């Protein structure tokens, strides 16, 4: 049984950056079966656990499920052009472990809010 897992990362809101000087990235994995998927954040290739919150349960959409994880950091870390943020979805498919990773960095960011 093959199913299509997709992973997307959403940028922080300008409001949060302006009002709280924090930036939250949201990673959404969808198209998988329950208990088959974990989400991990990496910053510059290093696993990050601080500031990470992952939903305890996946959400059902028809026959497949989705799961959301958030990574919160100081705004300056988000604006540092050298930083590379990555969400990795690890899951089982056809008896083997597979992974999909999505990266977001300054190329895809909005212009800095002055």
Task: Set out the residue ranges of the language-model regions.
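Terminal anchoring/processing modules of extracellular glycoproteins
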Residues: 1-114
């Amino acid at each position: 049984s093959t199913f299509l897992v997709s992973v997307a990362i959403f940028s922080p809101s300008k409001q949060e950056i302006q009002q709280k000087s924090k930036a939250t990235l949201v990673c959404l994995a969808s198209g998988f079966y329950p208990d088959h998927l974990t989400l991990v954040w990496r910053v510059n290739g290093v696993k990050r656990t601080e500031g990470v919150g992952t939903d305890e349960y996946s959400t059902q959409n028809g026959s497949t499920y989705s799961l959301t994880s958030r990574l919160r950091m100081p705004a300056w870390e988000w604006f540092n052009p050298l930083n590379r943020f990555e969400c990795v979805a690890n899951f089982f498919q056809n008896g083997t472990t597979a992974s999909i990773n999505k990266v977001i960095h300054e190329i895809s960011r909005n212009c800095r809010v002055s």
